[in-house]
Amino acid sequence: MLILTRRVGETLMVGDDVTVTVLGVKGNQVRIGVNAPKEVAVHREEIYQRIQKEKDQEPSH
């Protein structure tokens, strides 16, 4: 795992098309903004896991 330190307003790049910007820090919460092309799905981990679980439960044709 790559660990980076960023301050509010600073950005990191993921590949050529995705940026992640630290918008704010309040207590133990960090607000981030993600800019990505429409074809790149961006989800919170718990939402992504729910989507995957629902896909696994779909009957196959």
Curated annotation (Swiss-Prot):
Subcellular location: Cytoplasm
Pfam short name (any one): CsrA
UniProt function note: A key translational regulator that binds mRNA to regulate translation initiation and/or mRNA stability. Mediates global changes in gene expression, shifting from rapid growth to stress survival by linking envelope stress, the stringent response and the catabolite repression systems. Usually binds in the 5'-UTR; binding at or near the Shine-Dalgarno sequence prevents ribosome-binding, repressing translation, binding elsewhere in the 5'-UTR can activate translation and/or stabilize the mRNA. Its function is antagonized by small RNA(s).
The species this protein was found in: Stutzerimonas stutzeri (strain A1501) (Pseudomonas stutzeri)
Entries under SUPFAM superfamilies matching the protein: CsrA-like (SSF117130)
Upper classification of the organism: Bacteria, Pseudomonadati, Pseudomonadota, Gammaproteobacteria, Pseudomonadales
Name used for this protein in its record: Translational regulator CsrA
Domain of life according to the entry: Bacteria
GO molecular function, one term: mRNA 5'-UTR binding
Keyword Ribonucleoprotein: no
Gene name of this polypeptide: csrA
